[in-house]
Curated annotation (Swiss-Prot):
Its EC number is 3.5.2.6. Pfam families: Transpeptidase (PF00905). Keywords: Antibiotic resistance, Hydrolase, Signal. It is an enzyme of class 3 (hydrolase). The gene is bla. It comes from Pseudomonas aeruginosa. The modification N6-carboxylysine is found at residue 75. This is Beta-lactamase OXA-20. This is an oxacillin-hydrolyzing beta-lactamase. The active site is at residue 72. Residues 1-21 form the signal peptide. It catalyses: a beta-lactam + H2O = a substituted beta-amino acid. Disulfide bonds: none annotated. Belongs to the class-D beta-lactamase family.
Length: 266
């Protein structure tokens, strides 16, 4: 009995050790040069599943654990909320423009899910938030284990100006589940959201991603699909120069993804 107990205990220790070994994160300090090239401060997490064992690399690991407003990256789960709640039927559902002139030209027209995702059309998602309500939004967020799961706000949109916050590491967790259709929503809705996220596609790979910006900090999150597996990424940077800094999000992330052959060179 004692021998059996010790054998079981040893097996448990080995399994735990292996689990920790698989979860080990590599600090890629050399990626700092890509941030320096653009005079930017931020973090990026890259999870490469093209090999037998997952490879997780991060630049600025402490920041990767810090939570920030998700801004428009929240359109990824928010679209799932809206589909589940019946606030939108499908990608062909048209939302009529109210005629109010907004700062982004792409917002000043009728929208559907595809254009709203592509143009980051805030007013469409404001309609969703109003119909879903705070209590149901909180329930969805808790079910997803999304960041701090707090949709409260004193003013403005809770995913931009409110209390909702998520880290780069947590963004990766959500993206990985979405890739595998493992989020607690209908599979067909998850597949639709992934289709809406397509930014670029070639014969061998597909880039699915979403930007975000709250005025002070910018995101670019998503993944690149290869025949051998996906490469997930989540980047955020400070944007002290506001809109002048926005191009840096994709530029830095693309350079890093190219450095690990997750995207082809320009």
């Amino acid at each position: 009995m004692i021998i059996r107990f010790l054998a079981l205990l040893f097996s448990a220790v080995v399994l735990v050790s292996l689990g920790h070994a698989q979860e080990k994160t590599h600090e890629s300090s050399n990626w700092g040069k890509y941030f320096s090239d653009f005079n930017a401060k931020g973090t990026i997490v890259v999870v490469d599943e093209r090999t037998n064992g997952n490879s997780t690399s991060v630049y600025n690991e402490s920041r990767a654990q810090q939570r920030y407003s998700p801004a428009s990256t929240f359109k990824i789960p928010h679209t799932l909320f809206a589909l589940d709640a019946g606030a939108v039927r499908d990608e062909f559902h048209v939302f009529r423009w109210d005629g109010a002139k907004r700062s982004f030209a792409g917002h000043n027209q009728d929208q559907n899910l595809r254009s709203a995702m592509r143009n980051s059309t805030v007013w469409v998602y404001q309609l969703f938030a109003k119909e879903i309500g705070e209590n149901k939004a909180r329930s969805y967020l808790e079910k997803l284990n999304y960041g701090n799961a707090d949709p409260s706000t004193k003013s403005g949109d809770y995913w931009i100006d409110g209390n909702l916050a998520i880290s780069a590491n947590e963004q990766i967790s959500i993206l990985k589940k979405l890739y595998r259709n493992e989020l607690p929503f209908r599979v067909e809705h998850q597949r639709l959201v992934k289709d809406l996220m397509i930014v670029e596609a070639k014969r061998d790979w597909i880039l699915r991603a979403k930007t975000g910006w709250d005025g002070q900090m910018g995101w670019w999150v998503g993944w690149v699909e290869w025949p051998t597996g996906p490469v997930f990424f989540a980047l955020n940077i400070d944007t002290p120069n506001r809109m002048e800094d926005l191009h840096k999000r994709e530029a830095i992330a693309r350079a890093i993804l190219q450095s690990v052959n997750a995207l082809p060179p320009n």
